């Protein structure tokens, strides 16, 4: 299972309630949120995509000073949260977990002892926007909306039926994938032509990998930099642009200190939200944004903002819907094979502008496999609606 947990950290100043009491309160609230009453159920044999089914696990954990550092310092909380990255969720058991640390001394911008709350949530359950909304409803003071419990319990008959449906539907899904994949070829040609004509922004230039483009080891480290929105969105830019500017400066300095060349095409892969389709849990895509190293900070911020807008405009072009149409129909068996065959240890020769087979993923899987060169990155977590 590919690690994909998100960690949303919140700090509350001057909380007077004991941590254990707060944990019981939040556990009761979590039981009222439908999204937190679900888990993933695998289809036997992997013959179809997993289903969302009802799950009653409520996992709220408290961490006192003995778990991290004597005195409850914020440094100990950072170290404890970093250690959580190694303890990934199994969404087949529970797709979320809540951690409470407190009382915490010395938290940024806190005037008294505080409580740190960390929502650990599987990306299969929610993207960043959806996860933030869940956290907001979990931690708000207002009474939560009592919604209907999501249907379905996983039993032997539904499991067998789901496997049978996946097996019977395989030929149709495969044929649909081939047809849609073939339709992606003219759509791609059209996009390239419109790019050459200047109607669509061009993609970012490819960037040679640096020492940062390697698989990280098991150790994690966390630093907290608390900044106001106005600090990052200075000069009429956005928080995203301000953050990318800071990252650009940091990467440039780090590579220089390491004695490495700073690529002129230094690029960041940025997650960009898109309109949500139906009841999907993840509605985002990644775009490559040049970081413009070597330019003055004020100009760099402007250039990054312009590059981000161009990348968003390119990603929103209608041609991509036809290019990626086969993703929605690729059989689960083939998707699993592609994910298992993805090499996460060997970096590609260039980053920021993936080659044709990697960019089209499932839409061209058949032809890429035939050429023996498919190295598709794992797709976003995908599950079907509740079964039962």
Feature names for model-found ranges:
Residues 384-388:
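Extended, hydrophobic beta-loop-alpha segments that form or line the acyl/peptidyl-thioester binding
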Residues 9-19, 27-31, 38-383:
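Soluble acyl-CoA-dependent acyltransferase catalytic core bearing the H(X)4D motif
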Residues 1-2, 347:
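Short secondary-structure boundary/capping segments within folded domains
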Residues 22:
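His/Cys-centered metal/cofactor-coordination and adjacent catalytic loops
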């Amino acid at each position: 299972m590919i690690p994909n947990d998100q960690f949303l950290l919140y700090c509350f100043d001057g909380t007077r309630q004991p941590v254990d009491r707060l944990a019981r309160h939040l556990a009761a609230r979590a039981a009222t949120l439908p999204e937190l009453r679900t888990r993933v159920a695998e289809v036997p044999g992997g013959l179809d995509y997993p289903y969302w089914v009802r799950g009653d696990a409520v996992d709220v954990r408290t961490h006192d000073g003995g778990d991290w550092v004597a005195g409850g310092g914020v440094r100990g909380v950072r170290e404890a949260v970093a250690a959580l990255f190694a303890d990934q969720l199994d969404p087949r058991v529970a797709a979320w977990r809540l951690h409470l640390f407190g009382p915490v001394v010395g938290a940024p911008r806190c005037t008294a002892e505080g409580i740190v709350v960390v929502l650990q949530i599987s990306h299969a359950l929610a993207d960043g926007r959806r996860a933030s909304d869940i956290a907001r409803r979990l931690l708000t003071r207002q009474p939560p909306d009592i919604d209907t419990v999501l249907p379905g319990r996983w039993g032997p008959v539904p499991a067998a039926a789901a496997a049978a449906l996946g097996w019977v539907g395989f030929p149709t899904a495969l044929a649909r994938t081939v047809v849609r994949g073939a339709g992606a070829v003219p759509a791609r040609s059209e996009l390239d032509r419109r790019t050459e004509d200047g109607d669509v922004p061009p993609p970012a230039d490819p960037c040679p990998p640096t020492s940062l483009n390697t698989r990280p080891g098991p150790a994690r480290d966390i630093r907290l930099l608390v900044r106001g929105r106005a600090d990052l969105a200075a000069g009429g830019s956005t928080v995203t642009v301000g953050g990318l500017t800071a990252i650009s400066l940091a990467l440039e300095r780090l590579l220089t200190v390491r004695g490495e060349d700073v690529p002129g095409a230094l690029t960041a892969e940025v997650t960009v939200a898109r309109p949500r389709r139906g009841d999907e849990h993840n509605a985002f895509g990644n775009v490559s944004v040049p970081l413009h190293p070597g330019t003055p900070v004020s100009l760099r911020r402007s250039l990054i903002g312009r590059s981000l807008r161009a990348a968003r405009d390119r990603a929103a072009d209608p041609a991509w819907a036809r290019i990626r149409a086969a993703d929605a129909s690729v059989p689960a068996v083939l998707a699993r094979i592609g994910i298992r065959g993805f090499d996460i240890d060997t970096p590609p020769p260039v980053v920021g502008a993936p080659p044709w087979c990697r960019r089209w993923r499932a839409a061209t899987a058949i032809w890429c496999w035939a050429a023996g060169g498919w190295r598709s990155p794992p797709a976003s977590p995908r599950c079907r609606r509740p079964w039962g």
